[in-house]
Regions:
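Peripheral, non-catalytic segments flanking oxidoreductase cores
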Residues: 1-343
Length: 343
């Protein structure tokens, strides 16, 4: 077993790993992680948002239907801002673990690993701050000595919010035939989140996830990742490694958009593989509605019964607690598959 002395800033991920290993819970049917080096890297579809509006919308709709993921350039988020965000992010995660976990930073939004992990296949080798947009500028949000972090996070959140809205409105227009600037309803700074992620180098990378396979329980996600790589998505029943592109943001469709679009747009399973040598950083923006917001549909007939985001979120959390796995949209089908399991 490799020795791995964790520093003062590192979360006790190795302790979690070894505890699960001692329990002998290695294999529960989830395919083991696969190093990105063993897969062909693919560049996602790239859409330049400064191009012709109709052509951009068509390209995004095709990518959302075929891939569930795409990249956008010409997004208006300055490279200098993203680089500043990365510097501040590194300073934040270099703080002592006890300060991050118990110091109340960023409204106590710190999390690490997978508290509900019942086996190694449920363990995520990562740490994060998951921050509600409204709290970023709130006077009660504690940034400690990181005086520049508040302003940088606010700028990044505002910029990513504009990108998310632009993409969401364009994708919706392709299905309903007209422009609806308020789409999706119920999404504002009190319901959307900015997540700062760090994936530490992992000595058990061969059989550990950086982030376990999942789909996103939102309308859509906008991601800025570094150049380390590790993001993989399911395409044609196999995992595909996403090739990082420094000038692009990644957009992926969430479960709520798939339901609203009557399955035209795909919420695709994705994961992050652990890296034995390098740490990885990313920033994600989640476009979410209020808990009481109906998800709705672009038109009937819809394969899904009516539900709110709150109902969906509660069901996902209940499934994870009961089974260790997210079931997601199949729970809300009007006509579930025989046996009641996922499609």
């Amino acid at each position: 077993m490799p020795a791995f002395p964790e520093g003062a800033s590192e979360p006790p991920l190795a302790e979690s790993y070894l505890a699960l290993l001692r329990r002998g819970e290695r294999d529960d049917g989830i395919a083991p992680p696969c190093s990105a080096a063993l897969l062909d890297e693919r560049e996602l579809p790239v859409i330049d948002l400064t191009g012709d509006r109709a052509a951009c919308a068509d390209a995004m709709a095709r990518a959302a239907a075929e891939w569930g993921f795409f990249q956008v350039t010409g997004h208006g988020v300055s490279p200098a801002l993203l680089e500043e965000m990365r510097r501040e992010q590194k300073r934040l995660f270099r703080l002592p673990f006890e300060t991050k976990a118990n110091g109340g930073l960023l409204n106590g939004s710190y999390r690490w690993g997978t508290p509900t992990a019942a086996s190694l296949r449920h363990l995520s080798w990562s740490e994060a701050f998951h921050v509600q947009l409204a709290s970023i500028s709130g006077k009660d949000c504690d940034y400690g000595d990181l005086t520049a972090l508040r302003g940088v996070m606010q700028e990044v959140a505002d910029a990513m919010s504009r990108v998310a809205r632009t993409v969401a409105v364009a994708l919706a227009e392709r299905l309903i035939g007209h422009d609806d600037p308020s789409f999706p309803a119920g999404c504002d700074e009190t319901t959307c989140f900015l997540r700062l992620n760090r994936y530490p180098a992992c000595p058990f990378a061969a059989d550990t996830f950086g982030l376990v396979p999942h789909t996103d329980s939102d309308f859509l996600t906008v991601l800025c990742q570094d150049q380390v790589g590790g993001l993989q998505l399911m395409k044609g029943n196999r995992w595909v490694a996403v090739k990082p592109r420094p000038d692009a943001l990644i957009v992926n469709i969430g479960d709520l958009f798939q339901a609203w679009s009557n399955n035209r747009y795909k919420s695709v399973e994705h994961k992050v593989v652990a890296n034995a040598k390098a740490e990885r950083f990313s920033v994600a923006y989640f476009l979410c509605p209020s808990y009481d917001s109906p998800v709705g549909t672009c038109g009937e007939p819809s394969p899904y019964r009516a539900f709110t985001f709150g109902e969906y979120r509660n069901k996902v959390q209940d499934d994870v607690k009961r089974t260790g796995r997210k079931i997601g949209l199949p729970n809300f089908l009007k006509h579930p598959p025989v046996g009641g399991g996922p499609e």
